[in-house]
């Protein structure tokens, strides 16, 4: 149920992304999409560590882009249309009810989840610690190293862009 709600919300954000025309609204849509993707990857894996690292990496890059766009974009007023928010909320409600009515396995999935929650206290902590080892094993260590390289290159780009001696990035006119 949770995965379907996240996927339907992500699809609605994709549709909403096409209607955006202001850079700040596009940035907010991308940040919300990043949150949805990290929640989806977290529900697919045993541990949320990889999704947490991905979220921090993407949000770090988005902060750099946010600073760049706010310094270059003109001082236009950012208006949020109430009608579009109401339409999105109604679409989410309609999609979630349709998914609930069409998928017959949701009720059994909710029962299984409640049974799993009752058994959750009997999990061995040694088994939980072995799931973190998978993050640094051979196939996934490449992803971790690529994230480190990405963060380092982003750090170098920010240091290169923001030179204190040259003043602000945008000239005041």
Curated annotation (Swiss-Prot):
Its membrane topology: Multi-pass membrane protein
Enzyme Commission number(s): 7.1.1.2
Enzyme class at the top of the EC tree: translocase
Subcellular localization, as worded in the UniProt entry: Mitochondrion membrane
Catalytic activity from the UniProt record: a ubiquinone + NADH + 5 H(+)(in) = a ubiquinol + NAD(+) + 4 H(+)(out)
UniProt superkingdom: Eukaryota
Cellular component, GO annotation: mitochondrial membrane
Residues spanning the membrane: 24-44, 49-69, 80-100, 139-159
Chief localisation class: mitochondrion
Swiss-Prot/TrEMBL keywords: Electron transport, Membrane, Mitochondrion, NAD, Respiratory chain, Translocase, Transmembrane, Transmembrane helix, Transport, Ubiquinone
GO molecular function: NADH dehydrogenase (ubiquinone) activity
Reported function: Core subunit of the mitochondrial membrane respiratory chain NADH dehydrogenase (Complex I) that is believed to belong to the minimal assembly required for catalysis. Complex I functions in the transfer of electrons from NADH to the respiratory chain. The immediate electron acceptor for the enzyme is believed to be ubiquinone.
Annotated family: Belongs to the complex I subunit 6 family.
Protein name (Swiss-Prot/TrEMBL): NADH-ubiquinone oxidoreductase chain 6
Organism: Locusta migratoria
């Amino acid at each position: 149920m949770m995965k379907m709600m996240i996927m339907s919300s992500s699809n609605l954000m994709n549709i909403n992304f096409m209607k955006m025309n202001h850079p700040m609204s596009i940035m907010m849509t991308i940040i919300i999409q990043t949150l949805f993707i990290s929640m989806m990857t977290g529900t697919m894996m045993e541990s949320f560590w990889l999704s947490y690292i991905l979220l921090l990496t993407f949000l770090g890059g988005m902060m750099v882009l946010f600073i760049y766009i706010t310094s270059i974009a003109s001082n236009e007023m950012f208006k949020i249309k109430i009608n579009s928010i109401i339409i999105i909320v109604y679409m989410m409600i309609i999609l979630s009810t349709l998914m609930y009515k069409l998928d017959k396995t949701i009720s059994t999935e909710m029962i299984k989840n409640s049974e799993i929650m009752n058994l959750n206290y009997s999990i061995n902590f040694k088994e939980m610690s072995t799931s973190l080892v998978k993050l640094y094993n051979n196939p996934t260590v490449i992803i971790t190293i690529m994230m480190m390289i990405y963060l380092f290159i982003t750090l170098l780009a920010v240091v290169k862009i923001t030179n204190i001696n040259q003043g602000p990035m945008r000239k005041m006119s």
